[in-house]
Regions:
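Asp-based phosphoryl-transfer active-site loop
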Residues: 2-19, 223
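Short, small/polar residue-rich loop motifs at catalytic or cofactor-binding pockets
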Residues: 1-2, 66, 206
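Conserved Rossmann-like nucleotide-cofactor binding loop
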Residues: 13, 48, 218
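A short acidic, helix-capping loop that chelates divalent metal ions and anchors anionic groups
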Residues: 14-16, 51, 73-76, 182-184
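Glycine-rich beta-strand-to-loop/alpha-helix junction loops that act as flexible
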Residues: 10, 68-69, 213-215
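Active-site phosphate-binding/coordination module
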Residues: 21-121
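Conserved acidic, metal-coordinating active-site core of Asp-based
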Residues: 100-222
């Protein structure tokens, strides 16, 4: 079968953790795939507004599977799939992270915002040698314009179980980055695979004609 679509995670896959952007050799390899006639989608936990040109280093995806499948666009920016957290989910997260002194951010249309303990994220970005991409949102008013696609945070992994015990009825899932304290926080229905299905539908192809690459727990659906 001829493959028509290649879906690639960014952080840890296209961009090695120790580098501030996608390396030139990876950009060249992806462009070669596109030149061969295969469409390329980035499939990431980041929202579209949290992916800078500098990060991609010249890479131009044909499709964007962002916010772990909740924000899906074509190259022109047309929305193919859009799913949001509700107010109850969002406020429960804010209360919990404030109570435990941990960092919490949300992914919005215009980028990611740090709502709780933003300074923790800034320190982490400096330590990881990546450009700052999270807005200071500690005024906690960005959601009055539109609700977020997803959340992300930094907390001891044991605290995620405490959150589930208290707010399990909300269906939120904590997907940690390996053994670290960083995580994506997704709704029960949210998955990169839903974004992949939306892209395949837009292309008029069967998902079996797609190939995916990723390295994290939020990539399991597309793999």
């Amino acid at each position: 079968m001829q493959y028509q679509l290649l879906a690639l995670d960014i952080d840890g896959t296209l961009r090695p953790d120790a580098q501030p952007c996608v390396p030139r050799e990876n950009v060249a390899a992806v462009k070669a795939v596109q030149k061969a006639g295969v469409k390329v989608a980035v499939a990431t936990g980041r929202c579209r507004g949290g992916i800078s040109k500098a990060l991609l280093n010249g890479l131009r995806p044909d499709y964007w599977i962002c916010a772990a499948g909740a924000e899906v666009q074509d190259a022109a920016g047309n929305m193919l799939h859009d799913a949001r957290m509700d107010a109850q989910q969002m406020y429960a997260l804010v209360d919990f992270f404030e109570d435990h002194g941990c960092f919490l951010g949300f992914n919005f249309d215009d980028g990611p915002y740090g709502y709780v303990n933003y300074y923790i994220q800034r320190e982490a970005e400096l330590a990881m040698n990546v450009n700052s991409y999270v807005h200071d949102g500690e005024d906690q008013d960005r959601h009055l314009e539109s609700m977020p696609f997803s959340a992300f945070g930094r907390l001891p992994q044991a605290l995620a179980e405490q959150f589930r015990q208290k707010y399990g009825h909300l269906g939120l899932r904590f997907l940690f980055y390996g053994s670290s304290e960083g995580c994506d926080i997704l709704t029960a229905e949210q998955d990169k695979s839903r974004g992949l299905e939306a892209v395949c539908a837009a292309m008029g192809i069967d998902p079996a004609q797609a190939v995916a690459m990723g390295d994290g727990s939020n990539d399991c659906g597309i793999l």
